[in-house]
Design a protein with these regions (language model features):
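Conserved catalytic/switch belt of AAA+ P-loop NTPases
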Residues: 17-33, 46-47
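Conserved P-loop NTPase "ATPase switch" module shared by AAA+ and STAND
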Residues: 1-16
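Structural recognition of the conserved hydrophobic beta-strand(s) that form the central parallel beta-sheet
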Residues: 6, 30-36, 57
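Domain-level recognition of nuclease-like catalytic cores that cleave nucleotide substrates
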Residues: 296-317
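Interdomain motor-coupling "hinge/lid" segment immediately C-terminal to the ATP-binding subdomain
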Residues: 36-38, 43-143, 179
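Accessory nucleic acid-recognition modules appended to NTPase machines
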Residues: 98-258
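Active-site ExK catalytic segment of metal-dependent nucleases
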Residues: 257-268
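Short, polar loop motifs at secondary-structure junctions
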Residues: 38-43, 292-299
């Protein structure tokens, strides 16, 4: 019978890498470790363990897992709760009431910011860090650059260089609070140097401090939920740029598989329909294409080979 060793929060053990190397050399057991990114990032494991490990990144709950944890059926209210409260497993121990859940999430958020970002990265301008995190949360799914943020801040009499903005954004990424999505040319898949998008790792952490206005935020939440779904399915996710300034919300690649996705709240008028379906129709290949929305009556249809899906159905693919 094989032997297993499980060690939680291994970064609290001084010199843990020496012990692990000795155990590896003895070949006496399979070792499973967890660590907080406050003091140990995955990029450092290769130094500590000389590459002799397999890393598993643990994400928050998917939508189906959220339903299962909370013993819910898929419904309009369940989807709203998912978009509002996010995917952290501990929420299973709390009533899904905004005041209670957001208080818990604010504590988690503060811990991440103070331990995983400020302490680890040696952040000196904490006020700016919090402002940048809030700005990123309010601009989920929007194209922006560090240079533009720096210029905006200077117009508000806040002197932060482009390099400082880049470093602070990277610190938020290193703490797994936000994720960067690169922009590519749809035709040639050339990666652009500027014009990235950022999405939160957890919707609840995005909402708890910024304040949630569902009517104002719904498009952002839909896009963030789609990104999380694709990431959990191990796709490499990009946003696409087409000729004439047209945009594809998501290009997702996994091995030889490619899918294109447009996201919107509802098909309110013909202009919206033309934008969402028209951009996908302009892509001349045979990879799957989706328009994802909250339309109840038209979701499930197929227009010129493009699948129109309700968000709840897409998140269960």
């Amino acid at each position: 019978m094989p032997n297993y060793l499980f060690i939680d929060e291994i970064q609290d053990i001084a010199g843990f890498e020496h012990t692990l190397r000795s155990l590896q050399a003895s070949d006496s057991c399979d070792i499973f470790i967890t660590g907080s990114n406050a003091t140990m990032l995955s990029s450092e494991l290769s130094t500590y363990l000389s590459g002799r490990y397999i890393e598993f990144r643990i994400s928050s709950l998917s939508y189906p897992e959220f339903l299962n944890f909370h013993h819910l059926d898929s419904s309009t209210q369940s989807l709203r709760d998912y978009l509002t409260f996010g995917e952290l497993p501990y929420l299973n121990n709390l009533p899904l009431q905004q005041e209670i859940v957001f208080e818990y999430l604010r504590n988690v958020y503060s811990t991440i910011m103070l331990k995983d970002v400020v302490k680890r990265e040696g952040i000196r301008n904490v006020d700016f860090l919090e402002t940048l995190a809030s700005y990123t949360a309010d601009n989920v799914g929007c194209l922006f650059s560090a240079n533009n943020i720096s210029k905006y801040l200077k117009s508000q009499h806040v002197n932060m260089s482009t390099l400082q903005v880049i470093n602070y954004l990277r610190a938020l990424q290193n703490a797994f609070l936000i994720n960067k999505v690169r922009r590519v040319d749809v035709a040639g898949l050339k990666v652009f140097e500027i014009g990235d998008k950022y999405f939160f790792e957890d919707l609840g952490l995005r909402n708890c401090n910024l304040g949630l206005n569902m009517q104002h935020d719904i498009n952002k939440l839909i896009e963030n939920a789609i990104f999380l779904h694709l990431s959990q399915k191990h796709y490499e996710v990009f946003t696409g740029q087409m000729s004439g300034g047209r945009e594809i919300d998501f290009i997702a690649r996994r091995n030889d598989e490619v899918i294109y996705i447009q996201a919107t709240y509802i098909m309110a008028d013909e202009t919206t329909r033309q934008r969402e379906f028209g951009n996908l129709e302009a892509i001349r290949d045979n990879y799957p294409k989706y328009v994802v929305s909250l339309d109840e009556w038209t979701s499930g249809s197929c227009v010129n080979g493009i699948n129109h899906m309700h968000l709840a159905d897409f998140l269960r693919l």
